[in-house]
UniProtKB/Swiss-Prot annotation:
InterPro entries: RuBisCO_ssu, RuBisCO_ssu_dom, RuBisCO_ssu_sf. The lineage of its organism: Eukaryota, Viridiplantae, Chlorophyta, Ulvophyceae, TCBD clade. The gene is RBCS5. GO terms for molecular function: ribulose-bisphosphate carboxylase activity. This is Ribulose bisphosphate carboxylase small subunit, chloroplastic 5. SUPFAM superfamilies: RuBisCO, small subunit. One of its GO terms (biological process) is photorespiration. It comes from Acetabularia acetabulum.
Length: 183
């Protein structure tokens, strides 16, 4: 039956005009079909639930370089979004029972109940990426042991569009390489 289903998927893919890489079906001794792709250990790993904290956009990546941050700032400004810097001490950066404001029966991990301190004012009308980068540097110099993130807002939709870390404290041990995030 599995082979018949595989043949149908090949036919459907041929009708679409796109060649499809269909995994080879292997029958085990117990009569169960398995694909060869499942044999890879990496495909079946379990997410590490402890000390695997992440922030917003790009938090699954290694810390961004200055050049990568500059490209993101250019993208933000090209879309006419308003950049804004926020910072938080290490013990206040993650959502938790100690640092969340609760309004009703809301879980402590709900992101909107956790606020970071704003660095100056949002950069309304900013058109030069170097201004944003110099503010990131000034905030980093003022608070070297804090998490600093860049968020951007769309005035038309009146929502936050993106947010990502631009600085982690040197003492931070929360970042894990992608290979270390799984058991």
């Amino acid at each position: 039956m599995a082979a018949a289903m595989m043949n149908k998927s090949v036919l459907l893919n041929k009708q679409c005009g796109k060649p499809a890489a269909v995994p080879k079906v292997v029958m085990s001794k117990g009569g169960f079909a398995r694909t060869s792709a499942v044999n890879k250990n990496r495909d079946m790993m379990v997410w590490q639930p402890f000390n695997n904290k992440m922030f917003e956009t790009f938090s699954f990546l290694p810390p961004l370089t200055d050049e990568q941050i500059s490209k993101q700032v250019d993208y933000i400004l090209a879309n006419s979004w308003t950049p804004c810097l926020e910072f938080a001490a290490s013990d206040q950066a993650y959502a938790g029972n100690e640092n969340c404001i609760r309004m009703g029966p809301v879980a402590s991990t709900y992101q909107d109940n956790r606020y970071w301190t704003m660095w100056k004012l949002p950069m309304f009308g900013c058109t030069d990426g170097s201004q944003v980068l110099s503010e990131i540097q000034a905030c980093t110099n003022a608070f070297p042991d804090a998490y600093i993130r860049l968020v951007c807002f769309d005035a038309n939709r009146q929502v936050q569009i993106s947010g990502f870390l631009v600085h982690r404290p040197p003492s931070a041990t929360d970042y894990r390489l992608p290979a270390d995030r799984q058991v």
